[in-house]
Amino acid sequence: FTELEIKDIESKAYQMGVKTYQNIDAVESYYQKVVKFLIFGNVLKNNTYPLSVSAERSIQALEIIKYAKKINADYVAHGSTGAGNDQVRFDLIFQTLAPEIKIITPIRDQHLSRQEEIQFLIANGIELTWSKAKYSINKGLWGTSIGGQETLTSHLPLPEEAYPSQLQKKDEQQVQLTFSKGELVAVNKEQDLPHKCIEKLNKLASKYAIGRDIHVGDTILGIKGRVGFEAAAATITIKAHHLLEKHILTKWQLQHKEYLSNWYGTHLHEGLFLDPVMRDFEAFLESSQTQVSGHVYVSLKPYHFAIDGVVSENDLMDTDFGTYGEENKRWTADEAKGFIKIYANHIKRVKQTHR
């Protein structure tokens, strides 16, 4: 959030009657504990969603309960409904780390709809942009989710105006992303902390309205859900990082990483951040990144992007070793024939035996 947005949130909080307001900056912690591993794993839920909101809920819960214990609070509250995933993510961590603190959930307990919430705020003189209030918008480092009446259906798209970032630029622009051991450390040769680079990339790419989609998935409670999102930096970073990995990692590293990364993303999505197996996944993912360094070139265009290519000292696509589909320099034709003959043995045996 910008300083202006944070000030506006604080103003609204006092307008609604809070006694004290506290803003907790946990962006660096969020990156180090979660986002970094989502990048290492190229995590996209159902090959679509970069876990923009579900990824941050665990860190929010951890930071909230830490603050609640610091001030010796007897109660902690959250605004989740009784129909979604967030109630599980918050309650699970609150119950686990502070069972003595009572959880208050007014929206869940009173079965309040979004429209009822809006009417309550209007009746109490709270001023908001009500055209926007009809959408549930969750903004964070790794993207923004958008939910509304359209996403409660299986066929309606979100209208253009529902997306926070609108198309501002139409001229194509190429950017250079620099990775060091799997982490994004520079955008257009300007080095910075990884989470700052993500923010910088998002600022550039959001002007092209990149990263929009609608995710359909299974909730923790067992029902299908649909949510819109925009995540320019997340989608670009994941795709750029994945291409760099394709050039650097072995085929077995890539294959084993893929299914372990999916499990990591699934556990995180379902509120299981505190499960010890997550630390095991993270250790594997971190180990896989020791050679993943280099530059990736990305072209930004209206509503989409293209990954152009990579430059890395660790690139295994070595033309001195051989050129795919063209020529080789390390083996003879007879050696190739002998390899294929031996390689085919198990298939030949099956075909000869199972007639």
Predicted regions and their residues:
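Nucleotide-activated chemistry modules centered on ATP-dependent adenylation/adenylyltransferase
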Residues: 1-355
